[in-house]
């Protein structure tokens, strides 16, 4: 998932559906997608989820009930959600949001395959050693 496409469409409308836990993205021309908060959270572009390079990713679990509690624009190119579990360091470019919206089936399969390979349940709590504690270099 690159999240970096030169011609990424910019949503013309964005709606946070708190009860159904989805972000609705409306695009010029009539396209409309509903991206589950859980999918957004497990594919967060933040360093604490993605790591600083290949193989450093942290598999996210226990995010099925996560909500978006705040949503801030980042310039004219991205959104920064704050999730109910306290995660707020992911900056979601228009390209990444469009990828999450249009590749949901494949991304869910990839996520479930990673869970299975790790022998972890989707709703398992995150291990204490992988919880965010700030950023250290």
Stretches found by the model and what they are:
Residues 1-137:
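Motif-centric detector for short Cys/His coordination patterns
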